């Protein structure tokens, strides 16, 4: 088991999902960005680092029918499956490190709230982008949220990389066109504020 996996398994085994700093009662921004992507309800969507997030509950209730969740922590996924009950059987679950993920098919939307900013190693970021390119349909869209350049420098005790639009565009490289970007304030369960930046890109490269 990698050190990264050990860290996240420990987090989800020792904290309730609604006590972690990134918990949202309703992921309003994510839902809005996905809606603005204007993909059909049967288009495949993957929530990268989704863990125990309730985003999938809302997507299910809004009649999206092809939902996948990827997370390195099996404990996090178990929380989500338990919460969803029988609905969980209608979703696709993947326990894997995103930098090593082998997409079973291509997706219309790739959603990542606060995974990419944990990749402090350049090689890991390059691997992530390679997986992203393999995973997206032509003209598919990627939604990434990270701490902003004036936001926190750590999350869950780990160092992170802060981003703005120029920096994120440079990381993704050729084949991605920025559609929109902005900022958001997240309020943690303990009442702290965290400054996020969000980015929505369209994949402009042809599928290989």
Q: Model-predicted segments: where are they?
A:
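Class I (Rossmann-like) S-adenosyl-L-methionine-dependent methyltransferase catalytic domain
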Residues: 1-105, 119-135, 140-208
């Amino acid at each position: 088991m990698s050190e990264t996996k050990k860290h996240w398994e420990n987090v989800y085994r020792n904290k309730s999902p609604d006590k972690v700093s990134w918990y949202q009662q309703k992921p309003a921004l994510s839902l809005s960005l996905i809606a603005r992507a204007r993909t059909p309800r049967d288009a495949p969507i993957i929530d990268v680092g989704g863990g125990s997030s309730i985003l999938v509950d809302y997507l299910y209730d809004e009649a999206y029918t092809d939902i996948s969740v990827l997370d390195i922590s099996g404990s996090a996924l178990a929380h989500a499956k338990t919460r969803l009950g029988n609905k969980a059987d209608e979703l696709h679950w993947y326990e894997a490190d995103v930098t090593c993920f082998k997409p079973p098919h291509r997706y219309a939307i790739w959603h990542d709230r606060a995974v990419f900013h944990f990749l402090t190693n350049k090689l890991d970021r390059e691997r992530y982008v390679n997986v992203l390119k393999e995973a997206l349909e032509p003209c598919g869209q990627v939604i990434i949220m990270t701490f902003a350049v004036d936001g926190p420098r750590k999350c869950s005790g780990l160092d992170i990389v802060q981003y703005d639009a120029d920096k994120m565009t440079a990381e993704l490289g050729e084949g991605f066109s920025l559609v929109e970007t902005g900022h958001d304030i997240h309020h943690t369960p303990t009442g702290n504020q965290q400054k996020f930046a969000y980015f929505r890109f369209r994949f402009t490269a042809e599928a290989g």
